[in-house]
């Protein structure tokens, strides 16, 4: 049985971990880093780059380099958060045929799960390279406040990447697992996980209890904002730099996508530096040019200035914290530990705010970038039976219900209900002789149906004619351990029922997912061929270099015809090196190897002759030494014997 890997699929960075010898281990990627930028670049020649290589070419290829796509996953194009991002991103966010928010690169529409699948594939490959075996199963984390559509879309991304997603777990819960696994406290403790990542914010109140020798992680409440994170902090800094540059030079950089990409990189770097320094300088020579010539950007930014720019964003994390505490039935004094997760939580001002909310210092012994992947790996170990005596009780973050008469949402499952769970309620018809009912499934906290997220709708038909209010329609909601919902509607009189696994009235269809899986497999085949071609080129190049070197040293030992044949074979290889296919390059390399055989024989013969000559000289010298040494030994031996007599 293969390993179940744990993947933190982040907005800005992603991370992969496994269980090894009973302990979680974060795996370094091919570039030697423990986290991978969640960035995908589509190059002109059709190559798909992921991680650091994609980030490096972003400045010269801004329209085809996709980042922060997790903010769009499972979202509709019309949503105000999506509309806000359209003006900020250098790449195109477009409306799909089903109304979802998709992206565009190289004139091709791409679904966010397809982009996320490229990141997941990189994580999968990282684990496979380390383990030396194929990986097909994973636990993937999502923000606790992700709705059903976003969870389903994440699961789809896993499938496209060739992974069976064994479990979707919430990021704060995963971080709690990572924190609590090595704590052997006998008493129960309540912890707050404050997770401010690249694109999302979550707060979860979790109780870690020891129940009959089993460590139980129970999520008491969760809250958050799925459109608040480090990317927004970067944007505040970018906007400030643009405004300052405009004041100074009169040039607006907002329309210049190349300049914006350089600014994004510089802003992210400056933000990180300001967590450890009081001041930093953004220096971007040749940022743009006008009629008067090139323009350079040089701007000093203090920590205080940056804090004032993002103060409102930090403030926005307060209300969810207060709500989560209230929903959990906890007072601030009940919280034993506060854990910080997500790169943005490293900002000193954020840590100050957390201390202000909870009245105590947050812990610093949890790595904010790796804790979530570590927790996912532990959950993988639990599912595999490798980690024992751990029970995870997660919750559904938002209430679930259906639309009833008057456009009202009737809740069947309240928010923060432990999952998996099941609930049912009986409804009836609104009109006389109504033959069908439409079950409109909603997720959210508003009383008015239109104020909540529509997860989908389906019909139950064939209801026998009867006065309104007479038929008994039972609606059953069933949420699995991934937080994904299955809904059944049943006419109690006839036994007729209809059921669906909720897919947003958008979302990817099964056919689309299958097409994307095939496309991914095709790319994998292309990648393999590209790898084999690169290997063939390297081998050919090495052979040419070696033969040329040998020809310089030993070419005078060859006949003119032999030398000409080798030189011709070298030229043949050099001619196909750039544009030839793998088979042609391999054939020409083998032909060169055969032609160079004669040269090899001459080299070997000369080396043998030189070796023999050197050996003969050495033997003579050694014999002389031995004679002298032998005389001495004999004389000494004789002396001793004489004395003994």
Swiss-Prot record:
The lineage of its organism: Bacteria, Pseudomonadati, Pseudomonadota, Betaproteobacteria, Rhodocyclales. This is Chaperone protein DnaK. The keyword DNA-binding does not apply. SUPFAM superfamilies: Actin-like ATPase domain, Heat shock protein 70kD (HSP70), C-terminal subdomain, Heat shock protein 70kD (HSP70), peptide-binding domain. Residues 604-645 are annotated as: Disordered. The keyword ATP-binding applies. One of its GO terms (molecular function) is unfolded protein binding. Keywords: ATP-binding, Chaperone, Nucleotide-binding, Phosphoprotein, Stress response. Residues 605-622 have a biased composition (Low complexity). Belongs to the heat shock protein 70 family.
